[in-house]
Structure formats: C-alpha cells, structure tokens
Amino acid sequence: MSGEDVPHRAESSEARAAAVSDIQDLMRRKEEIEAEIKANYDVLESQKGIGMNEPLVDCEGYPRADVDLYQVRTARHNIICLQNDHKALMKQVEEALHQLHARDKEKQARDMAEAREEAMNRRLASNSPVLPQAFARVNSISPGSPASIAGLQVDDEIVEFGSVNTQNFQSVQNVGTVVQHSEGKPLNVTVIRRGEKHQLRLIPTRWAGKGLLGCNIIPLQR
C-alpha cells in the first residue's frame, strides 16, 4: 500500500461514518414521525373510533354531536401531513442506504485490488533471488585470454573467485595468490552480471599475453 492510499482510506472511512450518522438521524426522525402518527390515530380512536374516512355529519346532515369535530379534523389533517413526511423521509433513507451500499461496494473492490497487488508484490519479492554481495569488478579483458575463454565480461562483479569470497576478501592480492597456486587447475568463479548470478569455470593458464588470466580486476568500494 502506498503512502497516498493512507489519506484516501481515512477520507473514505470518515465519509462512511458521516453517511451512517446521517442514516441514523433519518431513522430517528422516522420513529418520531411514526410516534406522532400513532398519537393522532389514538385521538381518532378516542372519538368513537371514527377513523380517517367516517362522516362527520349525522344521517340528517347535521354535524355530529357525539365527537369533538375540531379534534377529529385536526388529527386527520396531522396524519395526512405526517404520512407525506414519512413517505418523503423513507425515500431519503432508501437513497442514503443505496449510496452507503455503493460506497461499501467500491471500498470492497478497492480493498480486493489492493490485496491482490500486495499478494503479487509478495510473490514477486519471494521469487526474486537475493544476490550475494560482490567484492571486485572486472574492468578489462584481453581477447583470447583465459578469462575471455571462460566467459568473463567487462563489468562482471565477482562474488566468489576460487576460495576468495566477500567474507575473506581483503585486497586483489588475495585473488592473485589463488591464481598463482591454481595454474592449470579449474577455478569456480561466481559473478553478478546485469542483476543475474552466473557460475563460470576459469583455468589460469600461460598464454601469449600477460599473466595467467588476461584480465584486470579492481576492488569494489563498499
């Protein structure tokens, strides 16, 4: 996960928390409206259970005397207004839930993509070999020399030269000593070339040129 993802994650978490808080506020308001609707229905129930549609006049067309007409009309009006408010509020709740689910789905997709990327990076890291540290570098090779025949190349970094390695290397004289004692004998040489490790077989031999190798080796500054 990159550093840029951290503020993005924090921003997403804050946005989700705000969305959840908004939904909770809407749900509280919904419960309040439903309680108010019930209270007004209770008023109608107290008036002979008159309900929302029963007539407020008697069979002769006169206002009913057995109920409080003002309370009934007020309760009916309140119920209609509150039901409209409830309907609009439920639409807000539905939209808020839809947005929250969409945000969660987007976050889930982003988390899955990040998890896949992290897993891929771990696989790449585990598959990438850890290259040993080199102690010297080849800076010149003569054509036709034992070093050239063995496959050494300019800029090869030497990790192991016979018995000389990073742990016991002190100076190029160590390499010279091994070469002098190995004339005509094969030496295992390990080099790093363009990020890859190569194993070579070098035989120090007298040839037309100078020395037994025909190459120049310089120590690496660490």
From Swiss-Prot:
Domain PDZ: 108-194
Lineage: Eukaryota, Metazoa, Chordata, Craniata, Vertebrata
GO cellular component terms attached to this protein's record: nucleus; proteasome regulatory particle, base subcomplex
Keyword Transmembrane: no
Family under the similarity heading: Belongs to the proteasome subunit p27 family.
Keyword Chaperone: yes
Residues with the Phosphoserine modification: S128
Family matches, as InterPro entries: Nas2_N, PDZ, PDZ_6, PDZ_sf, PSMD9
Described function: Acts as a chaperone during the assembly of the 26S proteasome, specifically of the base subcomplex of the PA700/19S regulatory complex (RC). During the base subcomplex assembly is part of an intermediate PSMD9:PSMC6:PSMC3 module, also known as modulator trimer complex; PSMD9 is released during the further base assembly process.
Keyword annotations: Chaperone, Phosphoprotein
Subunit structure as annotated in this protein's UniProt entry: Interacts with PSMC3. Part of a transient complex (modulator) containing PSMD9, PSMC6 and PSMC3 formed during the assembly of the 26S proteasome.
Protein name: 26S proteasome non-ATPase regulatory subunit 9
Matches recorded under Pfam families: Nas2_N, PDZ_6
Gene Ontology biological process terms from the UniProt entry: negative regulation of insulin secretion; positive regulation of DNA-templated transcription; positive regulation of insulin secretion; proteasome regulatory particle assembly
GO-annotated molecular function: bHLH transcription factor binding; transcription coactivator activity
Organism: Mus musculus (Mouse)
